[in-house]
Every structure is written in structure tokens, then in C-alpha cells.
Regions:
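Active-site beta-strand/loop architecture of penicillin-binding DD-peptidases
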Residues: 1-36, 44, 53-135
Length: 135
């Protein structure tokens, strides 16, 4: 949700799963609309974080996202959870970077670094999303 707030210029939105409900005849009987919890950060802070996350993709550990037909912001990471075990890897981000449509979070347990494991998984998901829905 934090990444989506960055994508929304600092506004934290309430998550929802259902766009609308239809009756048997296919008529919409209830429509769900996006609504905000409120400002999580200033628009300037969100813009600065977007820039930093874009740099992760352009020159940092988010290299799996480079060369996509869409722009991506992201942050990779790893989390230790038990001595002697492989770390959890993760990637969070949103795309397109300039007019976000989708936020993503990938967590791969006991798999290593975020740049090597989670980011390539996120790339596959985003590639399929944009192939189906366009930019």
C-alpha cells in the first residue's frame, strides 16, 4: 500500500477487490469507486521517492526491469529470517513510472536477493499485464 501511495502522489488509497456487481441480466447493480484514507506523505516526497525508485531500475539492483516497453520504478531487497537459511527476496514497484496503472509486490521466500529473484518475477507479471491491458 505504501508503494501505491507513492504512485498516487502521496495519497494512501483504500484497497478494494471488486469493481462492480451485476445482476443476472448483466446490468450493474453496485459500483465500487476508489476512495482515499488520506495523505501519507507530501506530493514532493512522493515525487522524490519515485525518482529514487526509478534510479534503482535504471542503474541499480532492479536491472531485470530495464528494457521493458513500459517504465518501472522499484525497490529490491532481501530479508534475513533465520541463521543459516537463504534470505527472502522481494521487489516492490509501480508502472508506468510517469502515469502509474499498477503497483506490484513480489516476495520469494528463501530465494536469495531481490534483484536476482523477485525482480525478474515482477518483470514477468508486469510484461503480461501490459501485454493484455496496454499502457
Amino acid at each position: 500500500m505504501i508503494v501505491s501511495a507513492i504512485a498516487n502522489g502521496g495519497t494512501l488509497m483504500k484497497p478494494y477487490m471488486i469493481d462492480h456487481v451485476e445482476n443476472v441480466g448483466g446490468q450493474t447493480v453496485k459500483k465500487f469507486l476508489p476512495s482515499a484514507y488520506g495523505a501519507l506523505m507530501s506530493a514532493n516526497d512522493a515525487q522524490f521517492l519515485t525518482h529514487l525508485m526509478s534510479q534503482v531500475v535504471e542503474i541499480g539492483t532492479g536491472s531485470a526491469m530495464r528494457g521493458a516497453s513500459y517504465t518501472v520504478t522499484g525497490k529490491t531487497g532481501s530479508a534475513e529470517f533465520e541463521t543459516g537459511k537463504e534470505t527472502h527476496s522481494w521487489f516492490v514497484g509501480f508502472a508506468p513510472a510517469d502515469k502509474p496503472k499498477v503497483a506490484i509486490c513480489v516476495l520469494a521466500e528463501e530465494s536469495g536477493s531481490g534483484g536476482a529473484v523477485a525482480a525478474p518475477i515482477a518483470r514477468q507479471v508486469l510484461d503480461r499485464y501490459f501485454a493484455k491491458y496496454g499502457q
